[in-house]
Amino acid sequence: TTATNVFCGIISATSVDDYNNNIIKKHEGTLKKRELLFENYLKNTGFNAEPVLLTYPDNDIITSIKNKYKQKIAEYEFCTTDKNSHLLWVVDDENDIRKIVETFKEIDTLYIADGHHRSTSSCLLANNLAKENPEHTGKEDYNFFMSYLLPESQLSIYEFNRFIKDLNGYSP
């Protein structure tokens, strides 16, 4: 929750297979230098510090499961330094987890809204570790990256312009 918006998504482990098989759509190029930097970071820390923001078409099944949990007290609640509040519910009911997984299997396309370098570097690392692992099964932790799945109706995209630093008194 921000001063002007409320978002309700799912934080999950997303398979690099979905990235490699183009279920997750990319719309930006990435810089090889940054890909390698992030891959090295992941290899050294073993930790995704920030989720990749993925968006999907609104879905009534997913929404109803999220709404069920929102009726309960959140497991975690915190406020960031920029005054954004966060409530986190743990989905631990096996039936709900199964429904979420099955529903996302039916969604043909996810789009990267933020995190092209993070997702690419996660895939690079997974592919490299798979080659090094003679017992690779596809279920290892390195085959997944942290993502925040948000329905497209809740997504707000703001212009980002690297070249304009000052509007000289004009409003956007």
Where are these regions (language model features)?
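Surface-exposed, charge/polar-rich loops and edge strands
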Residues: 1-172
